[in-house]
Amino acid sequence: MAVLVARVARFDCPREWPELVPTLVSVTCGEQPLASHRALLTLHHVVKTLASKRLTADRRAFHELTAALLPPVLAAWQQLHAAALTAPADSRLHLERARLALKTLRRLAVHGCRRPLESADAQTLLTASFERCRQALELRRALLDAGQPAALAEKYAVLHTKLLADTLETHPLSFVPLIQPTLEFCAVHVFTERGAGLLFEKFTVGCLNLIKAVLLCHEYRPPRDDGAPREPETMEAHRIKMAFFGSQPLEQMCRHLVTEFFPLTAADLAAWDADPEEYVSEDSGEAWRFSLRPCTQCLFVALFRQFQAQLAPVLLEMLRQTLATPPSPELSQALAREAVYSAVGMAAFDLYDEVDFDGWLQSGLLQELAIRDPNYRVVRRRVIWLIGRWVGVKLSARLRPEVYRSVTGAVTGVGPMVGSCLDACGGQ
């Protein structure tokens, strides 16, 4: 019914059906939980539909609607959020309504405000989202500790990151005052002990993608031409980025990504065993938007490209420490080794002058391809992938015949599932 009402509203609201939105708002703020929930659901679909209209007159009408809708919906969201925190036993209904209210506010703030931070209500929403998200994470942990379902709390927490990401993408210059709190919030929860017990995969992906979006935002890059005009917001955004990504935070983030996120998990190994071809192809396309491993890899590459001078020594030190340890078929050591090799492969173009790949290949990598222990398959696969990454960067022609023989031997001498995975990983 809510979707049907929204489809009618697309053509009739607000001109032919002016009472629709005021009626929904009044029911939303009422005392009947079920009626309030249904009104919020309908309002969400109506706002979502109206926000998708692109004609100038429709955009103007939606901006006017946003100015009238933001205050009551914001007040309802704040009330429902507080109710969910104060009554955890009854949090399910409160959380569902708070989530619907926040989804509506997300559309209003992103698509209904020309500059969100110039609207007092939109500014309140965005600045409050950091603390509200932290509270949602705490509520999720409390629900899990009590043995209760926490799926709604997870969706609610993730929605806060989507609000920030959409605002950054649609209004990058208006987002400048939020860059610092966004980076601090994401880094503290993902890369420090404060996030222990609070994180889950979708939220972690949302935080990492926010950091990457700030790094890669075109509007936050100063012009290369010294004579080009410089927007004050652009220069301020660049200053905030450079101040935040100092040497110590960068080193901490780099090490954490490689040691905590890059190693394969038990689930990864199970997926590999179940369907090798599917496993090596699942990280393609835009998997970084939703999956943790490709998300962390994309962030690592973005960090390395922008801060190569600071991060190259860190990664080289990790590589030296890894190579100082003899190859071991013990699974945990093999996984740690594979993670470092993965990082070196992703940074191949940035490490051209730093790594003697020919020497490394002859003194270690080719010998590692000959290790047949089942646990060492993760390193063998990564070595083949690593050679594929470096072959177009820095590999002597005289070594290629030996490389071909070693790779062929590594692929053909193992079981069918592992062999197909090794064969496919050359294109990963």
Predicted segment positions?
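Alpha-helical repeat/alpha-solenoid scaffolds of the HEAT/ARM/MIF4G superfamily
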Residues: 2-88, 195-361
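Amphipathic alpha-helical interface segments within eukaryotic helical scaffold
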Residues: 1-9, 13, 344-348, 362-391
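Alpha-helical rod/repeat scaffolding segments in eukaryotic adaptors/tethers
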Residues: 55-63, 86-94, 112-123, 143-150, ...
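Short, compositionally biased segments
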Residues: 163, 295, 411-428
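Residue-level detector of extended alpha-helical repeat arrays and alpha-solenoid scaffolds
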Residues: 36, 94, 98, 153, ...
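Non-catalytic protein-protein interaction scaffold segments in large eukaryotic complex-forming proteins
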Residues: 116-117, 126-202, 213
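Extended alpha-helical solenoid scaffold regions that build the rod-like backbones
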Residues: 113-116, 125, 133-143, 182, ...
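Structural signature of alpha-solenoid helical repeat scaffolds
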Residues: 31, 89, 93, 148, ...
